């Protein structure tokens, strides 16, 4: 299914019974969070609050509150189909040389499709129907959620931040939360390794006295939103990837006040600059860990202009103890990650990010072990291969007879196949999420790998245990008798 904009997606979800319009006035201060949280935990629909208290702009919440809706947003009918997207990304990340002329011809359509999905720049766009500048810029007119009682201020959560480094051709898309601190100012909370922060750092090195242009798109089409959180190869722009998901090119328009290009179909776009050296303390906010984070300093984004549709929709979410939308996104994107990892490590049979692990902090890997020490190679590979797993604190590796998605299986493997001293890998002073207050230093902490595989000669001097297996003939006999026994 192709969705040209967010409204296309809303219409399709409503047709499928996956979206509920809320006519009752609901406040964006705490109330929307409570309603969305209850709805998400029950696997309920996306919610369109049509009458937010004190505002005339509707609020869209819980949009990606089920894995099914994430899959729909990526152009798939169910989560299982996301493996195919992962296979495409794995190929684009590390394309293999053709094995012959026939193989080369078979791969040609893939490259042609990627090339044909280069973004299309248009001259007119819905996001430019209304332009507010100067004193007319007032973020307080938007129904920006205040999610938790201890939050310091309203927080923009689903803003698609668009940046460009001074030495780069492609633009970067990232989703970074933004604390509102004035009618035209927000704090841009991007971590130092994220694309936006890297672009800004390069700008400051080259132009230390010049303001840095930034745009934030709110309410883009689902493919563009999800393209920003997917492990797209560095050689492929998020806009081009969104085109692949959508089945047609992403339409962009030049920002009014800079050379940045923004999604033409966006509901709202914030245009402005970051003045080098202008920072502010951000937080505290309730976040995906289920705790309030500590206060830290980040750049201030000054909004010089708001462009929007005449009657825009404000897209929002909240983060809290799982399950929340980031955790649900993690469940769905998990299926994209598997083929990418398998391309580099074919011995991996499954990979699972338990949603209780706050989206990415714990990973379970099953593999076909081939030699002593193999499990340790795989766990080190998980930490280093994709940027998304830089902050994964715990990696559990076990054999392919274990179901990575069944805690009963995983715990059994840990408790029967591990010696705590021999099979635990500890790595100190590694990058850790700044929101992880359990680490001894902000942004720097340790990682633990658990080798719960069968041990090979060289890893143990003892005879390894033989798993109990049932007698198939007896199982068949009892199956035949079961109805006569009257047990259930």
UniProtKB/Swiss-Prot annotation:
First-listed, main subcellular location of the protein, grouped into a coarse class: membrane
Top-level EC class: lyase
Domain of life: Bacteria
Enzyme Commission code: 4.1.1.98
SUPFAM superfamilies listed in its UniProt record: FMN-binding split barrel (SSF50475), UbiD C-terminal domain-like (SSF143968)
Membrane topology: Peripheral membrane protein
Details of cofactor binding: Binds 1 prenylated FMN per subunit.
The UniProt record lists the keyword Ion transport: no
Keywords of the record: Cell membrane, Decarboxylase, Flavoprotein, FMN, Lyase, Manganese, Membrane, Metal-binding, Ubiquinone biosynthesis
UniProt-annotated binding residues for Mn(2+): 172, 238
Residues reported to bind prenylated FMN: 175-177, 189-191, 194-195
Subcellular compartments: Cell membrane
Alphabetical list of Gene3D superfamilies matching this protein: Single helix bin, UbiD C-terminal domain-like
GO annotation terms (biological process): ubiquinone biosynthetic process
Active site: 287
Reactions catalysed according to its record: a 4-hydroxy-3-(all-trans-polyprenyl)benzoate + H(+) = a 2-(all-trans-polyprenyl)phenol + CO2
Cellular component terms (Gene Ontology): cytosol; plasma membrane
Pathway: Cofactor biosynthesis; ubiquinone biosynthesis
Entry GO MF terms: 3-octaprenyl-4-hydroxybenzoate carboxy-lyase activity; metal ion binding
Entry keyword Acetylation: no
Protein function: Catalyzes the decarboxylation of 3-octaprenyl-4-hydroxy benzoate to 2-octaprenylphenol, an intermediate step in ubiquinone biosynthesis.
Subunit structure and binding partners: Homohexamer.
Family: Belongs to the UbiD family.
NCBIfam families with a match to the protein in the record: PRK10922.1 (NF008175), UbiD family decarboxylase (TIGR00148)
Protein name from the UniProt record: 3-octaprenyl-4-hydroxybenzoate carboxy-lyase
Gene this protein is translated from: ubiD
